[in-house]
Amino acid sequence: MSQSVESRTRIKSERYESGVIPYAKMGYWDADYVIKDTDVLALFRITPQPGVDPIEASAAIAGESSTATWTVVWTDLLTACDLYRAKAYRVDPVPNVADQYFAYIAYDIDLFEEGSIANLTASIIGNVFGFKAVKALRLEDMRMPVAYLKTFQGPATGLIVERERMDKFGRPFLGATVKPKLGLSGKNYGRVVYEGLKGGLDFLKDDENINSQPFMRWRERYLYSMEGVNKASAAAGELKGHYLNVTAATMEDMYERAEFSKVVGSVICMIDLVIGYTAIQSMAIWARKNDMILHLHRAGNSTYSRQKNHGMNFRVICKWMRMAGVDHIHAGTVVGKLEGDPLMIKGFYNTLLESETDINLPQGLFFAQNWASLRKVVPVASGGIHAGQMHQLLDYLGDDVVLQFGGGTIGHPDGIQAGATANRVALESMVMARNEGRDYVAEGPQILRDAAKTCGPLQTALDLWKDISFNYTSTDTADFVETPTANV
């Protein structure tokens, strides 16, 4: 017993020696650390500088993302520093990649302000990404403890309530983004909304960069868009909607636009990821108070999520946004024009939709996650998809998704309404085949051809886009299994 006490005393005294000592020696590395249920866990992909030991690099990341600075400071002794130090507790080499490592780090829950994504990210992705000891650093995954999740509101509406509100069950939602995204007048914009909804879509939406420009101010767009929504809903006998983008320069402007969207009768409004975490949480609170569905466009995410060795994996954004309280988020298509590895996309969708997820290394899920009853976020698939891919979309993405065909609706040679009808018929024929027990993936092209015999717009769409695909290998792919080509 006395030897153990002496050992602990020696280690503690070494830890507080004046000057610069290794982070691992300061207590930021602990291979014997016992993870607590209340710990926030993070998994970083680290590429140490030549000559830097991966354990020391991991300890440095733990230190600089929690309590450390470059030298020992005596004021540590005025805090519960042994508790508040983040602990790197495991380092594994990345399979089949030289000089990269997975570093597992645990953070005490008291390091983070309750219910604040901004405070969480200030630590986890704050200074550490510019740290000289690592050539590159990527945040791959996190585990949020239930006690911490309970301080966030989560989605106000979520998948189940949205289906009830829209009265749409047993199939994906269908939508489209107005094209061209910039340049239309308000009246022409509203006409696009009307034609798309009347043709069979559930939603039309603003794109990420349509706000309030000289060619069309926001009030004009809202009024004409909602006129189109109301006329199409009355004609179809279905509840329909249009995502009105309320993104603006200030929170005051965003609140004003959101309030007006509610006044004119919209059931859903939209924001962009680029507004920042605090603004996103603020708008989520507003949406909950005002009984509005909140759609989030992930504009800007690929600036830091696409490269495999540096930045942040999009699955982490999915987790933060579920905590923040958005109801929709763009999460990939697999078969479209944007980055989308099938296994990675599946991991994103499971993160948004499941009440609890297990470790699944092929999908990039490094931790089990209990979502503490936070509601489900509806994934949105958008970007370069068309009716001829319907069997693949249903197979990869399932029912719980919004399929958005922008160019695949508005680019139809027979007009917007015909494009919408083609997509609706393609989807319903594929869902019917699946429900009948057919192998809709293998038979997909034939199912579409059969449906097109009684739907001219679908036949035109199939003829026009039959050879269109985006067959590129993804940048961000699975580490633990061989992955199929991303964009089939």
Curated annotation (Swiss-Prot):
Primary location class: plastid
Cofactor note: Binds 1 Mg(2+) ion per subunit.
Main enzyme class: lyase
Any one biological process term the GO annotation gives: reductive pentose-phosphate cycle
Active-site residues, as the UniProt record annotates them: K179, H297
Residue numbers bearing the N6-carboxylysine modification: K205
Coiled-coil boundaries: none
GO molecular function, a single term: monooxygenase activity
Stated name of the protein: Ribulose bisphosphate carboxylase large chain
